[in-house]
A protein has these predicted regions:
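Metal-ion/cofactor- or nucleotide/acyl-coenzyme-handling active-site neighborhoods
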Residues: 2-358
């Protein structure tokens, strides 16, 4: 027993010394970045993998577009009529795209399409500013140009061709000044304005309002389509836009409100066809509207990728800036894939690259 006790007294200091040296050694390695940290590498690897997958899918879609463009486009009348009939039977744009006194009576409730909240009751004051009837009527325009804001329009020389359309739809108050007119034209029949733009550019119309009115001059007396009833916060600023034009806007665009019921129907229509985005983009909404009210639908500026299809040169997100869109809300490449399918079927025509002089 005495021998064992003596042995333990000798071993204990040695064990403690070895442990101390081991800890000190590992601390030294860590501080000098000799030991890699697995946790710091995992996200990077995941991010690279995700980015690689995204690029791969984009390349597939670009290849599809180029394949379709290798053949001369021709309208397929039977396909067009079939798709238009199906779209009209589900969404009813002619009677429901815009909130009117006919489809939204006094005392009825407006249900927001973008959020679950208490319905908005149509008061006398709100009813009075609603359009008395649908602005599209029962007429069908022979040709419509839906102009997206994609960077592919830069240096396209498509302005003259766009202006030749009978009805021209533009998205989110894009600039039409002399810098861009050659590429995007200046004719406008309908232009949309998201509430976010009214907040960002015009302080939500809580301060000076005349700059907003002046900025609308390039659109002439086009329809100004406001999504006033998508979200609760969209309503006040959209109503301020309406009253601003009523107070200051002689010879300015005519403000009307996008119908949330139409948007719900349209979202369901596209989801049934495999589009699972949170909500459709303005471009897809306007392309869908055009398919119901026009005999021939042409899309310009619809290209959701950062390289040109012809020569892979880098292009900006918009023809006027390189600001990122809300990709978490919209699924632009997937939407484009659906539109590309309609192009291939001869239902709509997507224009990529430069336009030929007329």
């Amino acid at each position: 027993m005495r021998v064992m006790r003596t042995l333990m007294l000798w071993l204990l200091p040695i064990i403690l010394l070895c442990s101390f040296c081991s800890v000190a050694f590992w601390i030294f390695l860590s501080n000098n970045n000799v030991i890699p940290h697995p946790s710091s590498r995992i996200p990077q690897k995941s991010s690279e993998t995700k980015s690689s997958k995204g690029c791969s899918k984009d390349n597939v879609l670009i290849a599809k577009a180029l394949e379709n463009y290798s053949h001369k486009w021709k309208k397929h009348e039977a396909n067009f009529k079939r798709f238009r009939s199906l779209l009209s039977s589900k969404c009813h744009a002619v009677s429901k795209a815009v909130v009117t006194q006919n489809n939204t009576p006094l005392g009825s409730n407006v249900i927001y399409d973008g959020e679950r909240r208490k319905p908005l009751q149509v008061t006398q004051a709100l009813f009075n500013i609603l359009a008395k009837e649908q602005p599209f009527g029962n007429a069908t325009w022979e040709s419509c140009a839906v102009v997206g804001n994609g960077g592919i329009l830069a240096n396209s020389s498509c302005g003259e061709e766009i202006n030749s359309a009978q009805f021209v739809i533009r998205c989110n108050l894009p600039p039409l000044d002399n810098r861009y007119e050659k590429d995007v034209g200046n004719k406008t029949s309908l232009v949309t304005a998201n509430p976010s733009i009214l907040h960002e550019k015009y302080s939500g119309l809580m301060e000076r309002r005349r700059p907003f009115v002046e900025s609308l001059r390039p659109y002439g007396q086009a329809l100004l389509l406001l999504p006033a009833f998508s979200y609760g916060h969209s309503t006040p600023v959209s109503l301020r836009a309406f009253y601003t034009l009523e107070d200051f806007g002689s010879d300015s665009p005519l403000p009307v409100f996008l119908n949330p019921e139409y948007l719900r129907r349209l979202l369901k229509f596209w989801r049934e066809r495999g589009l699972n985005s949170v909500r459709p983009s303005t471009g897809l909404i306007m392309a869908s509207l055009a398919l119901e009210i026009c005999s021939n639908v042409h899309l310009y500026g619809f290209w959701p990728f950062n390289k040109h299809p012809n020569d892979s040169r880098p292009i900006t997100n918009h023809y006027y800036d390189d600001r990122e869109s809300k990709k978490n809300v919209h699924s632009m490449p997937t939407e484009f894939e659906h539109l590309l399918k309609l192009h291939k079927q001869g239902v709509i025509r997507i224009h990529l690259g430069e336009c030929q002089p007329t």
